[in-house]
Amino acid sequence: MQKNGYRIQFTSSRIRDLMYRTTFDPKKMDGDIILNLSLIDKKDLDDVLGIFKMVISSGLSVTPYVKVISEGESIGDMTIEKGKVGIGTVCSITIDGVLLKAGIPVNPKLGGVVQIRNGIPVRFTDVLTYVSTTVDPLEILMSQGITSVSEMLRTGSGKVLANLREAPMVARDEIESNLSDLLDAGFSGILEVGEPNTRVLDVPIERDHLGIVVIGGTNPMAVVQEYGIPIDTSAMSRLISFKEMSRIEDLV
């Protein structure tokens, strides 16, 4: 499908490309990670950073690391316009890139909204598969206003953004070892690792595979939106060196 030189790229293809280009090593805390990038009004920066800190400290993000790009500064081929500030989080697909580099043929399957009840993940209530859309599912679902991440923070029950990937069950030991390394590196967003040949949060898993659910890196952005602060988010925006990221507590 091509028109006027433009070729449609489904999200699954973009994910595979970013996974192969991810070089982050959790043991060395170095390499390139995938960044979710949002634009906000400069006047809202302090409020947004406060919200990000609240969400991240509650464990509803992939890592405690963020990137702030001031007006006039550039990130890749993008320059932040006057009156705006860029703010980025680590995308959960970075985890898939790390697993892939470890020789585990992981397959990101879908993004969706997970219902949480009293702090326990119950089920996916809305999902979009990566092969069926040209826009990141979490970006779409966030724009629909169907999350209630802020309510989850207040009451322990609500709807948060998350995504699901499958991996061969024979690689379970290697998966757990690599997830442990990521946990040591501050990647706290692993929501659930399912049993082989078992549905995960009510989603069926391919035979001889297991499912892994990870919190979406755009949950902090979803809370900003829920608070009525204008924010324009581009999930899986680009690759960036992990060394350019800062811990949220160093910024607030």
Curated annotation (Swiss-Prot):
It comes from the Archaea. The lineage of its organism: Archaea, Methanobacteriati, Methanobacteriota, Stenosarchaea group, Methanomicrobia. Signal peptide: none annotated. Keywords: Transcription, Transcription regulation. Involved in nitrogen regulation. Under nitrogen sufficiency, represses the transcription of the nifH and the glnk1 promoters, via formation of a complex with the global nitrogen regulator NrpRI. Does not bind DNA directly. Forms a complex with NrpRI and the general archaeal transcription factors TBP and TFB. Interacts directly with NrpRI, TBP and TFB. Belongs to the NrpR family. Residues 8-247 are annotated as: NRD. It holds the Pfam family NRD1_2. PANTHER family: GLOBAL NITROGEN REGULATOR NRPR. This is Global nitrogen regulator NrpRII. Under nitrogen limitation, binding of 2-oxoglutarate to the NrpRI/NrpRII complex decreases the binding affinity of NrpRI to DNA as well as the binding affinity of NrpRII to TBP and TFB, which leads to removal of the complex from the operator, RNA polymerase recruitment and initiation of transcription. The gene is nrpRII.
